[in-house]
Amino acid sequence: ITVMIVSARGEEFDKISGLDGGADDYVTKPFGVMELVSRVKVQLRRRETRSNPANAEKLTWGPVEVDTRYHRVTAQGALVELTLKEYELLVLFIKHPHQVFSREQLLNQVWGIDCYIESRTVDVHIRTLRMKLGLSSSIIETVRGVGYRLAEVPQVAAA
């Protein structure tokens, strides 16, 4: 289910509360009908991409595995419960393992180009994603002054 909040409450705290609470988008009044239609189309495209079994794959990075067909994440074999945005961040990182993403790039890729959210929201989501991954949290590196990327997977020496 895609959740879009349409509200007259436009304070940053209200927006972050709504998005952190699981909303996929937050639109404040006043807004244009064309803007709302465009935002709905974006959410429908994302939903189609996520729900299409032809696009399903298993992504692995070190001890973390993502099954995109069943929307399931495991770290060291244990199931990890993620919010939609945390999941989308992790998938983006794993699909582009050596790329450094700025906060702005992550906002555009995960929340959408028309999203008006403070860039620190990304930091909060990265922090909670790291906590949920537990011992695997070190796979997401902070690149000071730039953004975030996946850490190199340690190579296991052949016996």
What are the residue ranges of the model-derived segments?
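A generic "binding-loop/recognition-motif" signal
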Residues: R9, E65, V146
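Residue-level preference for alpha-helix termini and adjacent loops
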Residues: E12-K15, K58, P63, V100, ...
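His-Asp phosphorelay/catalytic-motif detector in bacterial-type signaling
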Residues: I1-T2, Y116
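Conserved active-site beta-strand element of glycosyltransferases/polysaccharide synthases
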Residues: R149-A151
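Positively charged, aromatic-enriched patches within helix-turn-helix-type DNA-binding elements
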Residues: A23, R72, G77-V146
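Heptad-repeat coiled-coil signal-transmission/dimerization helices
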Residues: V33-L36, V40, R69-Y70, V122, ...
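Short, Lys/Arg-enriched segments at the junction into DNA-binding effector domains
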Residues: V42-V100, E104, V153, A158
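Basic, amphipathic DNA-recognition helix from helix-turn-helix-like DNA-binding domains
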Residues: T2-T60, A159
